[in-house]
């Protein structure tokens, strides 16, 4: 069978001639330009990265994009091919849409910076009743490795035309967050929907309510991959200390955003405040759960960095003198080195 419009239109191939297929329409419907085609029962030899894709990647690189999301990833080689084209500081998100990608999820996570659970095409490639379990499998794998995770497709589909979501949609978003999604994504609801601002507002309300009720204490005892084992251990320790002393926040100084991602992965009770000298890193941390990020001027010593952050937080009236924070950093500063320092600091105590 051949599926169009994420399974809403179904055709059956009855004859093949050279580069043409003749198909019988089993389930018809309205078809628009540039909509995808799925062949769930076939292994296509076409490359995941076309010549046109390469042109788009070069264009995006010239215009300083922060992320690239790669569709129809099959294995690590597809991700590596993209990484050969784009600058090193652009992060790559693998869209998991194919059965082949599920089989190769570990090797994909070895090289990708994050994954997107693209449920629309997954629901065509797999029986629909398997999609919720596959979603959890992908999110668990990403969280275990400390990679960004995004859940997408039809999260508030009814709100393309409706002012209120269905109860099932609210439950779906809540479950995606409880399962460990760093981000939830809207598609048609905002691109062609009647009231995109309202959709974003509803999504935000659901996310905030879920986060306020989510008990994440068990995450501190979860098993992790051995990747970044030292940084992961320090991130876990920072969250444990912050929880035990009821710290107002965890402050992380970062060059790449890796340490804030690992801290975020443990879902601390305290706010996560990050400082970086790099604009791209600040932009990329927008995808991380619970992270607020701020620019900081380059400093030569950790003490200077801490004083700058301390003064900023007081001036912005985020904290008062005497509030406790846990500080995480790598020393010496200004290099892409592993995090090696944790310190409990009282705001104003300098």
Per-region residue spans from a language model:
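Short, small-residue-biased leader/transition segments that mark boundaries at the very start
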Residues: 2-3
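Short, ordered loop/turn segments at secondary-structure junctions
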Residues: 7-8, 16-18, 26-28, 72-75, ...
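Catalytic P-loop NTP-binding/switch module of NTPases
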Residues: 20-57, 69, 178
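Nucleotide-binding motor/catalytic cores of P-loop/tubulin-like NTPases across gene-expression machines
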Residues: 32, 259-261, 267-304
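Long, charged amphipathic helices and adjacent flexible linkers at domain junctions
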Residues: 45, 93-96, 144, 202-239
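Conserved alpha/beta-domain cores
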Residues: 47-153, 159-170, 177
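C-terminal helical cap(s) of enzyme catalytic domains, especially alpha/beta-barrels
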Residues: 83, 190-213, 341-345
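C-terminal binding/interaction regions
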Residues: 321-328, 332, 340-344
């Amino acid at each position: 069978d051949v599926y169009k419009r994420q399974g809403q239109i179904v055709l059956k191939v009855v004859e093949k001639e050279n580069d043409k297929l003749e198909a019988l329409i089993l389930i018809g419907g309205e078809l628009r330009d540039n909509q995808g085609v799925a062949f769930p029962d076939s292994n296509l030899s076409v490359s995941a990265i076309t010549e046109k894709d390469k042109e788009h990647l070069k264009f995006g690189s010239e215009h300083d994009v922060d992320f690239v999301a790669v569709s129809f990833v099959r294995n690590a080689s597809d991700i590596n091919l993209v990484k050969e084209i784009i600058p090193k500081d652009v992060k790559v998100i693998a869209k998991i849409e194919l059965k082949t990608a599920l089989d190769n999820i570990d090797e994909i996570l070895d090289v990708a910076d994050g994954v997107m659970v693209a449920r629309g095409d997954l629901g065509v490639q797999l029986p629909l009743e398997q999609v919720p379990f596959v979603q959890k499998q992908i999110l668990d794998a990403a969280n275990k490795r400390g990679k960004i995770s995004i859940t997408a497709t039809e999260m508030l589909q009814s709100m393309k035309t409706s002012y209120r979501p269905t109860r099932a949609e609210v439950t779906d978003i809540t479950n995606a967050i409880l399962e460990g999604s760093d981000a939830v994504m809207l598609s048609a609801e905002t691109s062609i929907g009647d009231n995109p601002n309202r959709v974003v507002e509803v999504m935000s309300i659901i996310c905030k309510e879920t986060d306020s009720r989510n008990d994440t204490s068990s995450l501190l005892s979860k098993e992790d991959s051995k990747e970044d084992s030292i940084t992961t251990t320090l991130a876990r320790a920072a969250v444990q200390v912050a929880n035990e002393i009821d710290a107002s926040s965890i402050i992380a100084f970062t060059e790449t955003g890796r340490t804030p991602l690992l801290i975020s992965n443990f879902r601390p009770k305290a706010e996560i405040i990050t400082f970086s000298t790099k604009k791209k890193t600040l932009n990329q941390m927008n995808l991380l759960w619970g992270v607020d990020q701020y620019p900081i001027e380059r400093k030569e010593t950790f003490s200077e960095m801490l004083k700058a952050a301390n003064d900023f937080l007081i001036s912005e009236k985020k904290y008062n003198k005497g509030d406790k924070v846990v500080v995480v950093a790598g020393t010496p500063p200004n290099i892409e080195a592993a995090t090696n320092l944790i310190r409990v600091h009282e705001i104003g105590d300098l």
